[in-house]
Structures are given as C-alpha cells and as structure tokens.
Regions:
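Short amphipathic alpha-helix that is part of the acyltransferase structural core
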Residues: 2-45, 59
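Residue-level recognition of the GNAT/N-acetyltransferase active site
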Residues: 99, 104, 140
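Conserved GNAT acetyl-CoA-binding A-motif
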Residues: 117, 124-139
Length: 174
C-alpha cells in the first residue's frame, strides 16, 4: 500500500459506465449489487453520495473500493455522555453516516479500507460542506475489530447482541 498512495484517487460517482461498476467484486454480494444497481439512484434521490477509490495503473485505472455518505443524527446515550465532560450536552447530535464501505477482493487486508476511512475523516472535517459532530456506521460483527483499529468506538452497550453495532468517530479528535 505504501508505494501505491500516490496512485490512488477518489472521485464522486457520476457517469461511470455500468460495466465498470459491475466489475467491482468485494466479498459482500450485497455491497457489489448496491454499487451496480442502486448507487446512482440513491444519489439522484439525494439519499446518499457514493465515492469511488481508483488505483492508477498503466493498463487502465482500477476500481479498488467505494463508500457512501449521507446526513444523519444520533441520540445521545448515557454511555456516550459519560465520555464527554461538557457543561452543555445535547439530546441529539448531527452526524455523517458511512452507509457502505467496500474494498475489492483483490485489495482486501492491504490497508485500502483504512486509507478510505482516513480520507473520509479528513474530507468531512476539513471541507465542512455540512456540519456533523460524528462519523457513524453500523458495523457487522466481523468488521468491528477493523473499525476499532481505525479509532471508532461503540455508541451504546445495549446493542452488543445485535447483528450490527452502531459505532462512531468523534470528528473533534482530528
């Protein structure tokens, strides 16, 4: 991954041909189908924006991964409130939802997922097109360690037995 960083770039999904999107294969069939069949429609309906990660190659750029972002909010829990010692605490916080994040099978476990999370954190905190205190996501059980290694924490303890866990990253940490 180290030597490839200069050859990576992220673009917003626009008019990429369906054939390019169809070639993308992560280990999750649902995420593959979303990119191919629903990502453009979600953008048209203002539900989420999809960003594509490409690797510049001599024989043509390769789609390595993608993620989606949308606006959201989270209701503060006692668990989270205990972590923030402020005079004023809010019931609800604006948040930016990472709805989907996928990396191609060929590039899994090589740092590309962490690269995307760093890019998301930097972009939303620096560009500030919209305010959001937290990045949030619903992590499936087998991805929780990955998100914890990337500084995400659990929003609540109450969902520990659920198939997904709500996790967050506090953008004030940047």
């Amino acid at each position: 991954m180290e030597g490839l960083k200069d050859n990576l770039y992220i673009v917003r999904l626009k008019d990429e041909p369906n054939s390019l999107l169809k070639k993308f294969k992560s280990k999750d069939t649902y995420l593959n189908q979303f990119l191919e069949r629903r990502a453009k429609r979600h953008q048209d309906e203002l539900l989420a924006i999809t960003y594509l990660l490409f690797l510049r190659k001599n024989d043509g750029d390769e789609l390595v991964g993608y993620y989606t972002l949308s606006c959201s909010s989270v209701t503060a829990t006692e668990y989270v409130r205990s972590k923030f010692h402020r005079n004023k605490q809010y019931e609800d916080y604006p948040a930016i939802l990472i709805g989907r994040l996928a990396i191609s099978k060929d590039y899994e476990n090589k740092g590309f997922g962490s690269f995307l999370l760093r890019a998301i954190k930097y972009t939303v905190s620096e560009d500030q097109y919209i305010a959001g205190r937290f990045l949030i996501l619903d992590a499936v059980k087998d991805s929780i360690d990955f998100y914890q290694k990337n500084d995400f924490d659990f929003w609540t303890k109450e969902d520990k037995d659920e198939p997904t866990r709500l996790m967050y990253f506090d953008l004030l940490q940047i």
